[in-house]
Amino acid sequence: MYDWLNALPKAELHLHLEGSLEPELLFALAERNKIALPWADVETLRGAYAFNNLQEFLDLYYQGADVLRTEQDFYDLTWAYLQRCKAQNVIHTEPFFDPQTHTDRGIAFEVVLNGISQALKDGREQLGISSGLILSFLRHLSEDEAQKTLDQALPFRDAFIAVGLDSSEMGHPPSKFQRVFDRARSEGFVAVAHAGEEGPPEYIWEALDLLKIKRIDHGVRAIEDERLMQRIIDEQIPLTVCPLSNTKLCVFDHMSQHNILDMLERGVKVTVNSDDPAYFGGYVTENFHALHTHLGMTEDQARRLAQNSLDARLV
């Protein structure tokens, strides 16, 4: 079944480039940039990938991202991910990147963007993988900081297809960012946002009504609100669900408890994605395979999930 799932044409719509930084590349970049790491070796770092919640993961994620310093680093990060896409027949990807993770530590916005954009261009030309880049604001920072990031992005408007919202969800509702999303949409950006991962269904309502998003990233807690579920079904609002991430971060205690197939059978346009694959134990095919192994996902369901991902593309 794994090989069949791997060969299925699919799109990935929820992937953080910084979260695809495999330990081997992390150590290589640290050596290239002469950065001392707190882990003795690759296996010690892998051993640290045991998280009880989103925040524990984010603490390690930001620490790991510190090795990314130059255009070449960001190119190598993105290119390594695109090679994974090619190997798993991901024919289209819409990755996120978090400029604030880098600008806050003194890396120029253009350095980050140039490296990523060149790799995506090469991915189109050499690997045949189409793509669109999503600029994501960090919700644990202020809206003023997000506004500054949007200012930095506007001279490169054509490099992005959308703006998003990620990082620590609890205590940082979508309403906190209404003004910057209003402004981004007025500049022609499509909006997406993480909502309903650890946060309550109310956060999904806010993301839809205040941020006017076209796609919900995660959204698994929507199932707790019947009226919200009906709206998502009626309006066919896509959900970019990340099963391995959800179990690794204890949103669900075990994959057998995941609700993605329940949502699929109710008519929700759910998709399968890897989120931060270097940290969560798998890329897109591994996520599909986990659904087959633990939830008995059928070939028909897998085809529908893959088709949903292709239908839910922004570009």
Curated annotation (Swiss-Prot):
It is an enzyme of class 3 (hydrolase). Binds 1 zinc ion per subunit. One of its GO terms (cellular component) is cytosol. Keywords: Hydrolase, Metal-binding, Nucleotide metabolism, Zinc. GO terms for molecular function: adenine deaminase activity; zinc ion binding. Its cofactor is Zn(2+). One of its GO terms (biological process) is hypoxanthine salvage. Its EC number is 3.5.4.2. InterPro entries: A_deaminase_dom, ADE, Ado/ade_deaminase, Metal_Hydrolase. It comes from the Bacteria. Substrate binds at D276. Zn(2+) binds at H14, H16, H194, D275. HAMAP family: Adenine_deaminase. This is Adenine deaminase. It comes from Pseudomonas putida (strain ATCC 47054 / DSM 6125 / CFBP 8728 / NCIMB 11950 / KT2440). The lineage of its organism: Bacteria, Pseudomonadati, Pseudomonadota, Gammaproteobacteria, Pseudomonadales.
